[in-house]
Amino acid sequence: MFEPFLLAVEGQEFLTGFHVEGPLAGLIIILIALLLLWIFKKVLKLVVVLIGAVVGYFVGEAVEPSLSLVFAAGFAIVGIWAMSGDKSKKKGKKQRSILKDADDWDDDSWDDEGDWDE
């Protein structure tokens, strides 16, 4: 049997030293799944930043080999900044549409001006 599910086996005192029954085992499995998802999210961000650093290194090698590590560090910093979240929320500003600032975006009065059939 797969070892993590041994906690859910009734009558087994594996690893914990106490008897685990259905609802508690389900709660433990759900909490472990949530922890793994949280860790995967963090690892995924780290992988994206590392890929950016490798791309920066290769760009640096193509441009100037002596600056390849500087390019890699720069791309890694940009990757960390990009993965840190939504920048507009941190500033407290709301995104506005271009149409909200325009005064006449729904002004149909130009249709009534002049007679085109003359």
Swiss-Prot record:
The chain crosses the membrane at residues 20-39, 46-63, 67-85. One of its GO terms (cellular component) is plasma membrane. The keyword Nuclease does not apply. Its main location: membrane. It is found in: Cell membrane. Residues 103-118 have a biased composition (Acidic residues). Keywords: Cell membrane, Membrane, Transmembrane, Transmembrane helix. Residues 85-118 are annotated as: Disordered. Residues 88-97 have a biased composition (Basic residues). The keyword Translocase does not apply. Signal peptide: none annotated. It is a multi-pass membrane protein. This is Uncharacterized protein AF_1991. It comes from Archaeoglobus fulgidus (strain ATCC 49558 / DSM 4304 / JCM 9628 / NBRC 100126 / VC-16).
